[in-house]
């Protein structure tokens, strides 16, 4: 038999050192192996595959997939999610100058009395800018407006024989008349939302005008309405500031089609506008619609029995 070399005392001490260093690691390994892994009763009793497989004869039909399909993401859901993720970031507030821009747009347009004079685009700066007369004129100049009046495209097609084919000409006339009727409808809706104003800032009411009840922000009807305060004209420094008016004067998107009262114009704005149109011609923003109110019967006839 071969002689087995005996371990010296130096080798034994080195082995004992290695075993001492491995002890904490071995304890950690044994502790992890011994700790039971939490499993549900279904996982312990049944073998659940990681990926679901569809067997032939049991494939999901279209109406089954509807139950698994997530509902569509609407605008309201996206707003709620955005508010949850970023609660500090609210919607941007409208600025002070935004109201001035809206109020100026409600006033009638001003044109020079002589049509051959080019239109100066700085005319609206006189309402909000103190030193507007020192500003240079816009380059290039805006040409004067054209007033067509009754000479519209419909009268041009009807009078001039530009279209030889009678059938084609009739189609163009019918389509143009249909577009003009649609324009009248849109004009009537615009008058309900923002009625035209005169040079004094007063509303030009149509015949048989009826004042509507005020609808509050919460959707409640107020009999006398809320007296809105006019927005003062800001200077050049305050144009970009948030609106100082804390009343619920700016309608929400939900009530954009509701008949809300408009904010009255500022007295300073009307005064500057009247001084501006001394040598100019003021025309309404859009011509008043020719739509007439529906005729109401004077008295309803009593129906006799058997009368249809």
From Swiss-Prot:
Per its UniProt entry, which superkingdom is the organism in?
Answer: Eukaryota
Query: Which segments does the entry list as coiled coil?
Result: none
Q: Name one Pfam family in it.
A: DUF4532
What tissue expression does the UniProt record report for this protein? Expressed in Testis.
List the InterPro entries hit by this protein, alphabetically.
DUF4532 (IPR029206)
Protein name in the entry: Testis-expressed protein 52
Task: Give me the gene this protein comes from.
Answer: Tex52
């Amino acid at each position: 038999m071969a002689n087995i070399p005996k371990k010296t005392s130096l080798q034994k001490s080195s082995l004992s050192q290695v075993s001492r260093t491995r002890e904490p690691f071995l304890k950690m390994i044994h502790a992890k192996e011994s700790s039971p892994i939490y499993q549900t009763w279904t996982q312990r009793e049944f073998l659940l595959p990681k990926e679901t497989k569809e067997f032939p004869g049991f494939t999901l039909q279209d109406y089954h997939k509807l139950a698994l399909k997530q509902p569509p993401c609407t605008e309201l859901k996206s707003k709620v999610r955005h508010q949850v993720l970023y609660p500090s970031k609210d919607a941007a507030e409208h600025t002070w100058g935004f109201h001035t821009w809206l109020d100026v747009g409600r006033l009638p347009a001003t044109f020079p009395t002589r049509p051959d004079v080019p239109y100066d685009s700085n005319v609206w700066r006189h309402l909000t800018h103190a030193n507007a007369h020192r500003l240079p004129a816009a380059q290039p100049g805006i040409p004067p407006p054209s007033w067509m009046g009754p000479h519209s495209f419909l009268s041009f097609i009807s009078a001039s024989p530009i279209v030889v084919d009678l059938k084609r000409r009739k189609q163009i006339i019918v389509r143009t008349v249909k577009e003009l009727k649609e324009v009248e409808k849109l004009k009537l809706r615009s008058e309900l939302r923002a009625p035209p104003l005169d040079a004094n800032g007063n509303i030009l009411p149509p015949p048989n005008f009826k004042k509507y009840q005020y609808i509050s922000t919460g959707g409640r009807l107020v009999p006398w309405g809320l007296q809105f305060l006019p927005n003062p004209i800001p200077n050049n420094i305050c144009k970009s500031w948030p609106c100082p008016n804390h009343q619920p004067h700016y309608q929400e998107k939900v009530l954009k089609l509701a008949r809300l009262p408009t904010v009255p114009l500022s007295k300073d704005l009307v005064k500057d506008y009247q001084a501006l149109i001394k040598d100019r011609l003021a025309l309404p923003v859009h011509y008043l619609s020719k739509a007439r109110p529906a005729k109401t019967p004077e008295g309803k006839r009593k129906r006799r029995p058997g009368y249809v």
